[in-house]
Amino acid sequence: MIATKLNPALSAVLAVTALIASQPAAAISITFDYSYDTSGFFAGHADRQSLLNQAASEFTTRLQDQLTAITSRGYKHFDAKFLDPSSGAIVTKNDYDIAANDLVVFVGGQNLGASILGEGGPGGYSASGFSSLALNRGQNTTTDFGPWGGAISFGNSANWYFDQDATTTESFSGYDFYSVAVHELGHVLGFGSAPSFGALVVNNQFTGTASSTLYGGSVPMGDDSHWKQGLTSTANGVTQQVSMAPGISASQRKHFTELDFAGLKDMGWEVSPVTAVPVPAAAWLFFSGLAGLFGFARRRMA
């Protein structure tokens, strides 16, 4: 199963498978930065990088937000902050620029412990000379969320399954790297950590309109702001367990389901509908840690 807990180390330093019939043009892009992959988890492994891009496409084909650029010039300074995906150390990139409609995600691998598959979340920042609206990329922080990107670490000792083509469904052993990447990207987008998400959690129930309408009532939450383990929804017309539950089993594939997308919609992301022709669908824990300094939040999957 996947469990969500507070990460003490973080709080100490920082508080598909379908044929698409019709689909609007993507509005956002996700760029993976391997410059902190000092452990070599991705170096020389084109298959792993390809799977990351395939995981990102689950979001870039559905999210239609218009994110403003962040440009450090003159008196305007934007310093991006995140945890090094290969060491966990705090990284600050001074006068960092982000292109319009792009999210940058730093990725790498490290020893995350005996049961941790991945760790990820949106990055933080310190800045001067920018308005609050500009820092949040033109999004209202009360009802929306506009990160610059974030970071994801993958456990380098996990028994991974690296699919050659995530659009196919076959039996496999090990833990599905693609599914973990999709889950952690959900956290980079603010699932479980964005203020606009937290504002909708009441008595451990998620009360967002889109999610409640789809589920048939308030959605029960699991540990540390995941969906409750065992909830199901559909992805490309196929019923499966939700991606943003706190756990995944070996030999299990999880796409980002309609309930997962509804959660993003409720926290402010503009999610387009999709028409698809479905094909047949064929534990470790997701650990989630929140941190507060500079608005940084990071999630872990184990």
Model-derived segments and spans:
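Extracellular zinc-dependent metalloprotease catalytic-domain scaffold
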Residues: 27-182, 188-275
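A short, hydrophobic C-terminal helix/tail in secreted or cell-surface proteins
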Residues: 278-297
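Short, charged juxtamembrane terminal tails flanking transmembrane helices
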Residues: 299-302
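N-terminal signal peptide c-region/cleavage motif recognized by signal peptidases
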Residues: 21-23
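Intrinsically disordered, low-complexity segments enriched in proline/serine/threonine
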Residues: 10, 26, 222, 280-282
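Bacterial N-terminal signal peptides that target proteins for export
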Residues: 2-12
